[in-house]
């Protein structure tokens, strides 16, 4: 249910409405808006990179994963509601609220992933991960339907009229969190070491243990590179759509189409990923990403001014397929490689890799788009996925799982001896 709840922030604040509102209304200058949005989004992700391993390690040692998940969610809800205060020209207020809101959201996403190994097995982890991802897209579809109907009935077609939707996003998140708060139990502690160590000691310890998981390191490097592209597309999807002439209510409908495609893909992944294999699944979706971004680049190079709107609608299906599949399959790899007693720490590193990728990718894409041009930015985006695919070919899933099992056996021996 938490995957369903936080879709309101993902869709309305990160992807769809707030980026356009910020660029066109709060800033009021397209070039400056692209630059400031990339700076704000990347800045928040850089801070998440610093916090992720600390939060993950502390949550593991104090057995407070649920508390961290709920706490970050509540903070994100409050800050999301405050976005209604961002009026025309007040871009600095928008950044002052969005940056901490995104930090809370991203830290919660990391913690949510750490629950995965405890509710699945190595055989079912792909399916369970995809089910959670699918719930998120179902929530997205319902929310977008509400927004589309509201925009149509109330005539809220222009970005200047979108501030009430930020309150709807906060309310949706708050209501959707209630089942998690009431019914999800704190996972049973598996790490009984003293909790008095400093944060620096925890990070050094986590890094020392990570060194024993070579395949996880290889995957994180690959994920880091193709994560540049995924995070960039999430942050700039609405802005790119607007560049192709998709605006107002049509922008909401485009996002609805993208979400339907992504949700359908997540359902397919939930059913077939464990059968097809995580490796084949990830390689397939990276191929879809490369084809989609390369097509956008070709269109921009051949039709630089006023490209046909229908082209972006068509390519949006490829983007939706990529979004729906690459996230859940990537999360499955981390769960597959993580020993159970260090899940929050290792998912913290996964989150750190993803957020650092987003920080670098969003910043570089936004600045290139603002100061060099759309074609150069799209070429950069295509390169992210291509290099990520090449690096992923070096990851050995079986070897990575054996590394996790060895770590679990060693931990059981140490725990049994009372060390």
Residue ranges with predicted function:
Residues 1-45, 215-254:
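Helix-loop boundary and gating motifs at the non-cytosolic
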Residues 59-74, 275-289:
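Cytoplasmic membrane-interface "Motif A"-like loop-to-helix N-cap segments
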Residues 279-327:
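C-terminal transmembrane helical hairpin of 12-TM major facilitator-type secondary transporters
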Residues 79, 90-108, 307-325:
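Hydrophobic core of transmembrane alpha-helices in multi-pass small-molecule transporters
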Residues 31-33, 150-171, 367-385:
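A membrane-interface helix-boundary motif in multi-pass transporters
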Residues 186-221, 411-419:
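Juxtamembrane intracellular "pre-TM" segments in multi-pass secondary transporters
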Residues 70-89, 287-305:
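C-terminal ends and interior cores of transmembrane alpha-helices
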Residues 50-64, 264-278, 369:
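Helix-to-loop junctions at the C-terminal end of transmembrane segments
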